């Protein structure tokens, strides 16, 4: 009878086509969902069954051999390793068979066991097949093992009517994941708290900038658009998580045991109708859109500041419309292109799996915005350092200049999203171990809390915002004081000075600051004239001719002409932006507001 020698690579003969085709669909830097895993399993099963028909149609491949199967082992393992007895101990039946005749007989037929394709097995040998790449959570460096007995049948589990197989190397990530689960739980808590805090703080910041009319200017309008993009990004993340993982925990959605994989493979294929995935696809689409708009409004902030510094003729109101279209419209274009391509060429699952190179339709524009914004940041810091050296020459030491430069740079970093550049060239799937944990904690922390940092620096710590809040608070407390004293009837009021038993409060330019003027704090002549007139209290609303009056704002404490871009002053900024040239002194004032 003819003999057929199994080539060393025959163990992968049936599986390689399945692995290569499935690998084209599974993207290495995405998270596998349960629906996508089911799809890949059914696809692998169909391709395996096709290969089985081709192999079984060649009877010469499965004929009995008179010369034996001495070199037919497909395990790829040395015999001394198989004799260890840890993974695949020899049966008593095999021990009784002489070594020279162990491989004589009919081989075990190839088959699909609902997880992977098993090739022809040499009788009396253990067959090892690499763990399939199309099962996302498997250890792809391990092997699965089966034993082919001398009768040409796959060995059964004692006491059970099922084939024995050892998947322990493949599922080691599934059986020992306590520490990994702790890491993922901690990362989930970080980004949940971070986006929640950012959403709350940004909501307050937008309400403040929208409420006070004195804060309405081009720069603050751009800030409000940026704040809104951060808010929508946080909301879209929460909605996406709720939709994708509704009805199942993260464990159930992404972690499948060996028995669950078998049950899934035996079930009918998942429905391919788009209506079944409409909700999650809409959630994923809006998440990608708001993610892209957030990156592009960060770029708009950089372009605006760069234009103020380097463009002599810059109409802020005119460019605001262009910035608005750029920030909200351009991301809509490439996200719409991605949706069209995905719906046409890879309309599977919830679209949260990128399906190969189609992800670059969205990722390339986002990466381009990050790189461009980083270039703008470097150029602006260079100009800032030059102005600091020119302005402070001879007035402060070098260490003080460096401290000012460092402070200004740190203030600009959240606005420009500089932290994105750190791990931009290192996808998280290309690293492992401690470096992977460092990268993930870094990105989750800064990405989720970036909105909070931006709201703190550019709204809550803004000098003009604080002044407007103080004025509003003073007016509110003053109105309450009016009502309280009016009900008590202890004083009379008019549009002149307010007269009380202890002080005189001028309802004038300084009233907005809520500063009561005590006679003890006034000059002697002013205190005498203001407090009494010929020993009598002054008449409300009456001012004696020639009486000395306090200036509205002391010259020594006069506010600077322009509080600057970074400090948030809107006064005079729009008018001065259209000037032919921006004076160097004014530019320096804009930068020194952060020092």
Swiss-Prot record:
| Any single Gene Ontology cellular-component annotation | plasma membrane
Task: Output one GO MF annotation.
Answer: parathyroid hormone receptor activity
Compositionally biased region (Low complexity):
547-559
Which region is the signal sequence? 1-28
| Residues where Phosphothreonine is found | 553
- Presence of the UniProt keyword Acetylation in the record: no
Listed A to Z, the keywords are:
Cell membrane, Disulfide bond, G-protein coupled receptor, Glycoprotein, Membrane, Phosphoprotein, Receptor, Signal, Transducer, Transmembrane, Transmembrane helix
Q: Name one GO biological process term.
A: cell surface receptor signaling pathway
The glycosylation sites annotated in the UniProt record are: 151, 161, 166, 176
Q: In which tissues is it expressed?
A: High levels in the kidney, with much lower levels in aorta, heart, lung, prostate, testis, and skeletal muscle.
Q: Which residues lie on this side of the membrane: Cytoplasmic?
A: 210-223, 316-318, 382-404, 461-595
Q: How does it assemble?
A: Homodimer in the absence of bound ligand. Peptide hormone binding leads to dissociation of the homodimer.
Q: Which family does it belong to?
A: Belongs to the G-protein coupled receptor 2 family.
What the protein does?
G-protein-coupled receptor for parathyroid hormone (PTH) and for parathyroid hormone-related peptide (PTHLH). Ligand binding causes a conformation change that triggers signaling via guanine nucleotide-binding proteins (G proteins) and modulates the activity of downstream effectors, such as adenylate cyclase (cAMP). PTH1R is coupled to G(s) G alpha proteins and mediates activation of adenylate cyclase activity. PTHLH dissociates from PTH1R more rapidly than PTH; as consequence, the cAMP response induced by PTHLH decays faster than the response induced by PTH.
What is the official name of this protein in its record? Parathyroid hormone/parathyroid hormone-related peptide receptor
The primary gene name is PTH1R
């Amino acid at each position: 009878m003819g003999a057929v020698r199994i080539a060393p690579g025959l163990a992968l003969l049936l599986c390689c086509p399945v692995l290569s085709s499935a690998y084209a669909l599974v993207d290495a830097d995405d998270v596998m969902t349960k629906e996508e895993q089911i799809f890949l399993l059914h696809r692998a099963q169909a391709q395996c069954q096709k290969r089985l028909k081709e192999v079984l149609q060649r009877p010469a491949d499965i004929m009995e051999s008179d010369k034996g199967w001495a070199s037919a082992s497909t395990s790829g393992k040395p015999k001394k390793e198989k004799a260890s007895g840890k993974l695949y101990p020899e049966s008593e039946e095999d021990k009784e068979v002489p070594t020279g005749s162990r491989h004589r007989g009919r081989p075990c037929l190839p088959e699909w066991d609902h997880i992977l394709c098993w090739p022809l097995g040499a009788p009396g040998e253990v067959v090892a097949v690499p763990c399939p790449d199309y099962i996302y959570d498997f250890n792809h460096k391990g092997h699965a093992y089966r034993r082919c007995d001398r009768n040409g049948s796959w060995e059964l589990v004692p006491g059970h009517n099922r084939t024995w197989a050892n998947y322990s190397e493949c599922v080691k990530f599934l059986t020992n994941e306590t520490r990994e689960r702790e890491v993922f739980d901690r990362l989930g808590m970080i980004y949940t708290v971070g986006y929640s805090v950012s959403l709350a703080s940004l909501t307050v910041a937008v309400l403040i900038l929208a409420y006070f009319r004195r804060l309405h200017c081009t720069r603050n309008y751009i800030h409000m658009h940026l704040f809104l993009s951060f808010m929508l990004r946080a909301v879209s993340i929460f909605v996406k998580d709720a939709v994708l993982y509704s009805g199942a925990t993260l464990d159930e959605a992404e972690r499948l045991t060996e028995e669950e994989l078998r049950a899934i493979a035996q079930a009918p294929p998942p429905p391919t109708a788009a209506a079944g995935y409409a909700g999650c696809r809409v959630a994923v689409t809006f998440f990608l859109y708001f993610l892209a708009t957030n990156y592009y409004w960060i770029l708009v902030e950089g372009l605006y500041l760069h234009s103020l510094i380097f463009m002599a003729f810059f109409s802020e109101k005119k460019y605001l419309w262009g910035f608005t279209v750029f920030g909200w419209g351009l991301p809509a274009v490439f996200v719409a292109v991605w949706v069209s391509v995905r719906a046409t060429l890879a309309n599977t699952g919830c679209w949260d799996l990128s399906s190969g190179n189609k992800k670059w339709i969205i990722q390339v524009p986002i990466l381009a915005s990050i790189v461009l914004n980083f270039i703008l940041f470097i150029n602006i810091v260079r100009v800032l350092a030059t102005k600091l050296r020119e302005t402070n020459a001879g007035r402060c030491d070098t260490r003080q200049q460096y401290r000012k430069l460092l402070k200004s740079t740190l203030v600009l970093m959240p606005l420009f999203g500089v932290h994105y550049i750190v791990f931009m060239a290192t996808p998280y799937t290309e690293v492992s171990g401690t470096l992977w944990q460092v990268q993930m904690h870094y990105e989750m922390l800064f990405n989720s809390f970036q909105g909070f940092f931006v709201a703190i620096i550019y709204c809550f710590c803004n000098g003009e915002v604080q002044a407007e809040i103080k004025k509003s608070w003073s007016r509110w407390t003053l109105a309450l004081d009016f009502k309280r004293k009016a009900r008590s009837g202890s004083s009379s009021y008019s549009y002149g000075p307010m007269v009380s038993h202890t002080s005189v409060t001028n309802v004038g330019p300084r009233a907005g600051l809520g500063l009561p003027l005590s006679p003890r704090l006034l000059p002697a002549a002013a205190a005498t004239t203001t407090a009494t007139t010929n020993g009598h209290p002054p008449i409300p609303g009456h001012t004696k001719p020639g009486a000395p009056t306090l200036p509205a704002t002391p010259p020594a404490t006069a506010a600077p002409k322009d509080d600057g871009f970074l400090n948030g002053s809107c006064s005079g900024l729009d008018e001065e932006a259209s000037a032919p040239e921006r004076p160097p002194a004014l530019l320096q004032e804009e930068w020194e507001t952060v020092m």
